[in-house]
Amino acid sequence: MEEKDFIVNVGPQGTFKPSGLYHSIPADIDAMFLRYEATSVKKITIYFHGGLVNEKTGMATAIKMEKHFSSIGQTPICFVWETGLIETVASNIGKIADTKLFGKLIKILTKKLSSKLGFDISEGRGAGVTLTNAQVEVELSRKNPFENYTQRNLESKGRGADASTNLPAKPEDLEGEFKFEIESDFELISIVGESKLTIPNAGGGQSRGIIDTALLIKSLAKIAFRVIKRFVGKRDHDFYPTIIEELLRELYIAELGAWVWNNMKVKSNDMWKDNSGISDINQYAGRYLFDKLVDFHKKYPDVQVNLVGHSAGSIAICNLLKMSSSNYPQLIFDKIIFMAPACRIDLFRDEIVLHENRFKTFRMFTMTDSNEKHDLLVPYFYTHSLLYLISGILENEGNDFDAYVLGLERDIKATPPYDSVKEITDSNKFLYEAGKNRTAFSQTDGTASEGLRTQSLSHGSFDDDDATIGSIKFMLS
């Protein structure tokens, strides 16, 4: 089978416009459905890879999944909609981490916050005894720095942030402490004078430029206050990742590339726009295929259509469901399968949980929270998974923290402080409904039934995991 026989490449703004070495045209999709008619196709599976990869990886994934689906009698359609996010973010994180200024700021923040949050006693140092420079250096030399600095460890010793009595009421309360730290470090002052950072401007936006020590003091106080507030509200992502998230949000959001994530989400929606009055490669690729699928379904209403999505592919599927229900509700999808879904829980609730009439079966494969926290996105620097980074800083172009993401077990369990969030409790009831087997957490043990087995230990590896792929093939057979 040639690539054009099963791959739909989505270009800029969700159209057929070329964006790389490979591109699709409307005629390719026309030919697909002519072949389906000629061969009396009865089962179609549409696959969406994660919107986090480049063209080469997206194409390789499509070719791999085509073989899996074809081997069980499914006719595959694989969307390739590359954005390169993972390369952009990982590369930018590495560049930021390598700067002298960043290294200095991390040391200042970890020393100050370890004591403020109660890790002084929980780690056996005694009340008010801060980490030494040598201790900080030792932690930062580890692939997973401050791994044991968690809410659970604090609470087990009665030292949760909410148990402290000397916490600041506002960021300004911390400025004096950071003022002493910064103004006594002449090397840091010199580095600050040579560094450009992204800072809030008078217009309410952000601009990039040199900052002075006074502004840096205010920024560090804001970062520390937000970390403390997240710990008190139990909305943290553990000690070190939370500090990294808030430091990036305050001073490095533009350099991080949060805009890439937003652009990917926009593309996942744009591809389903109406093509009325548009022609040729200016048409929206997803909608063009959908309209052809509708015509095919009208002729052959017994055709089975499945949707499978990995990571951000779940967002594309949710957007497809919204559009499909408005334009052709007669198309009921047979099975919807998510792997490590990166969609927000409110989107999932609105398009899947509240509309079970749109499909027959749903299942999600994702990691346990423990495994999610040991999937090191960037060792030594951001030490939780990509889904944690999305939740912590990428949603809403950096303006949201601890956004609710479907693939994170900690969010869908609906335990405090998430037990009063409506979209979470609604989704929890759906996902854990007795007898439905809608969730499988990696790694499953030897007692897991066929169709519920998964062994992946990294966000990006679900589509390479034999157990997960075997479960999906079992479901679709």
State what each model feature region is.
Residues 47, 61-65, 289-292, 316, ...:
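Short, hydrophobic/aromatic alpha-helical segments in well-folded domains
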Residues 21-36:
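A short loop-to-beta-strand scaffold at the N-terminal edge of the catalytic core in hydrolase folds
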Residues 47-49, 79-80, 308-310, 338-342:
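Short His-Asn-centered micro-motif
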Residues 35-95, 166, 170-250:
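Short, surface-exposed "cap/lid" segments of acyl-processing enzymes
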Residues 307-313, 317:
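Gly/Ala-rich beta-loop-alpha elbow adjacent to hydrolase catalytic centers
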Residues 56-62, 318, 348-350:
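Conserved strand-to-helix beginnings and helix N-cap segments that scaffold or border functional pockets
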Residues 1-23, 83-155, 159, 198-304, ...:
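Lipolytic serine-hydrolase domain surface
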